[in-house]
């Protein structure tokens, strides 16, 4: 009997040892051998970069360069790549365009050839979003249709698209105008008393565009939607911290201060949105007419999709899906337009001749009357200016995808698990595409449209390109056109003496040390 027990104990110990060794081998393969195998394959195809460092990759080096780049402002010019992406810039300068960096254990190649960029953005099923390599808590913010793939993405995009038709955008214009009118009236009163009015425009436009999205998405004012906005801002800061860390699987489940706070914020936002949505759904089921805002259009479109699919349970979006899309409306809807208006104002302050051209065009079209939808879309100079601002200061500085299986890209075979980065902010400065003045603010390059400016290359990506082009790009551009037109009707503006040029990126490209601009009321 003792012999039997001893044999059993040995068998159990051997089994445990084998399991531990198997687990250790899998971890070692995940953390070392797989990255090294991918590195070897990339080098064999002519890609160059730093050798892989266990788990951390280039994160320490990148973090140090990033910290150094942001430690001081720069001269006012548009050569912002060394400040926004110093490590990528250094890597490409050192190893060439066919290079790679390490995001922890994940290799990331840089793609800068127009035909390869087109291939990546055309085949979105092969080149997918890379949120899975980050802490899962990142998805509390980076959610909705922009984060989905495959059938779920197709379904969500189909349901959401009706909210962004030209007809719907036209119906939103009065709500846009009310928000801008209220802000500009306050500015006018201050300017009349003081002769001018100094404004830190980025936080001001941030609040303004949040007010706009609250009205057009939920039919509520900024005061009512303000809590959601403030919570999303806090969640955004915490999300950035997560994305900068090397993610270790399981880390998101630990009760760290950051993890706990992110979960608390997400629950609070979700509960508030659920209350709004359930109230709307109850009214629709009672036969009441739907409201003509983004949420109303989304809910009606969702009901139609469910009916079209034979009232199947998974035929449309669930309440949780709708909540995630509302978060995306709030975050993307206000953030993109806020930064676009900020950089447009700063660049027009530095280029007063273009400010005057745009003002003359606006006054000729509308005088001092409220801008109308049809003529707003035919403001040529204003459109050219916005396109040029989006070229020099795109909302996001890169588009990064990941391949989940070996994938042919041109003459290369990209190994499974590799990220593919399209460095937007660099592509927008390529002299071979944009000419010798690529670093200069020159809206005339868009006089014959984007296709002519890019020589029909896929190298202008402020809102991405292809099947996954941003659904809200016309929403952002219309709001920016209206805002700029209404400001030009009432004010001249110049950057304040205190302004220092320091673009940096927190998901979007923002001014690091403030964005003070002086507004002077136009003579009647």
From Swiss-Prot:
Lumenal side: 1-11
Residues exposed to the Cytoplasmic side: 33-524
Pfam families: p450 (PF00067)
Tissue: Upper and lower leaf epidermis.
Main location: endoplasmic reticulum
EC assignment: 1.14.19.62
Cofactor (UniProt): heme
Annotated positions binding heme: 470
Catalytic activity: loganin + reduced [NADPH--hemoprotein reductase] + O2 = secologanin + oxidized [NADPH--hemoprotein reductase] + 2 H2O + H(+); secologanin + reduced [NADPH--hemoprotein reductase] + O2 = secoxyloganin + oxidized [NADPH--hemoprotein reductase] + H2O + 2 H(+)
An annotated GO BP: alkaloid metabolic process
One term of GO molecular function: heme binding
Gene Ontology cellular-component annotations: endoplasmic reticulum membrane
Superkingdom in the source lineage: Eukaryota
Keywords from the UniProt entry: Alkaloid metabolism, Endoplasmic reticulum, Heme, Iron, Membrane, Metal-binding, Monooxygenase, Oxidoreductase, Transmembrane, Transmembrane helix
Membrane topology according to the record: Single-pass membrane protein
TM stretches of this protein: 12-32
Location of this chain's protein in the cell: Endoplasmic reticulum membrane
Pathway noted in the entry: Alkaloid biosynthesis; secologanin biosynthesis
Purpose of the protein: Component of the seco-iridoid and derivatives monoterpenoid indole alkaloids (MIAs, e.g. secologanin) biosynthesis pathway. Catalyzes the conversion of loganin into secologanin. Catalyzes the conversion of secologanin into secoxyloganin.
Family listed: Belongs to the cytochrome P450 family.
Protein name: Secologanin synthase 1
């Amino acid at each position: 009997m003792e012999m039997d027990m001893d044999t059993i104990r040995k068998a159990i110990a051997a089994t445990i040892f084998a399991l531990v060794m198997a687990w250790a081998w899998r971890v070692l393969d995940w953390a070392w051998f797989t990255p090294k195998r991918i590195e070897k394959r990339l080098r064999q195809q002519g890609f160059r970069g730093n050798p892989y460092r266990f788990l951390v990759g280039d994160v320490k080096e990148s973090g140090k360069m990033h910290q150094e780049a942001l430690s001081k402002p720069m001269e006012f010019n548009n050569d912002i790549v060394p400040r926004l992406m110093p490590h990528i810039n250094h890597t490409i300068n050192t190893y060439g365009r066919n290079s790679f960096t390490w995001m922890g254990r994940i290799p990331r190649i840089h793609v800068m050839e127009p035909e390869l960029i087109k291939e990546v953005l055309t085949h979105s099923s092969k080149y997918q979003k890379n949120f899975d390599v980050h802490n899962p808590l990142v998805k509390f913010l980076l959610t909705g249709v922009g984060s989905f793939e495959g059938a779920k993405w197709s379904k969500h995009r189909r349901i959401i698209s009706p909210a962004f038709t030209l007809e719907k955008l036209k119906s939103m214009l009065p709500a846009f105008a009310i928000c801008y009118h209220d802000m500009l009236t306050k500015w006018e009163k201050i300017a009349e008393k003081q002769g001018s009015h100094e404004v830190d425009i980025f936080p001001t436009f941030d609040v303004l565009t949040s007010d706009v999205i609250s009205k057009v998405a939920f039919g509520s004012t900024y005061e009512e939607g303000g809590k959601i906005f403030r919570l999303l801002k806090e969640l955004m800061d915490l999300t950035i911290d997560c994305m900068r860390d090397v993610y270790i699987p399981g880390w998101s489940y630990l009760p760290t201060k950051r993890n706990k706070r992110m979960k608390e914020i997400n629950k609070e936002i979700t509960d508030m949105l659920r209350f709004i949505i359930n109230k709307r759904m109850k009214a629709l089921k009672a036969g009441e007419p739907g409201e003509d805002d983004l949420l109303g259009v989304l809910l009606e479109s969702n009901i139609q999709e469910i009916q079209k699919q034979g009232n199947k349970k998974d035929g449309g979006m669930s309440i949780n899906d709708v909540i995630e899309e509302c978060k995306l409306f709030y975050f993307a809807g206000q953030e993109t337009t806020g930064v676009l208006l900020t950089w447009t104002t700063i660049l027009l302050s530095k280029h007063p001749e273009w400010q005057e051209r745009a003002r003359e065009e606006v006054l000729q079209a509308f005088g001092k009357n409220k801008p109308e939808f049809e003529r707003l879309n035919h403001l040529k100079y204003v459109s050219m200016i916005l396109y040029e601002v989006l070229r020099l200061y795109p909302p996001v500085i890169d588009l990064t995808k990941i391949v989940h299986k070996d994938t042919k890209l041109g003459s290369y075979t990209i190994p499974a698990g590799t990220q593919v980065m399209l460095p937007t902010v660099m592509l927008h400065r390529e002299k071979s595409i944009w000419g010798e003045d690529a670093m200069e603010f020159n809206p005339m390059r868009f006089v014959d449209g984007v296709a002519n400016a890019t020589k029909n290359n896929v190298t202008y990506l402020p809102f991405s390109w292809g099947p996954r082009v941003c659904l809200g790009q016309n929403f952002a551009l219309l709001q920016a056109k209206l805002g700029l037109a209404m400001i030009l009707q009432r004010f001249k503006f110049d950057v304040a003496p205190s302004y220092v040029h320091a673009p940096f990126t927190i998901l979007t490209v923002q001014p690091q040390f403030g964005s003070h601009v002086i507004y002077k009321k136009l003579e009647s």
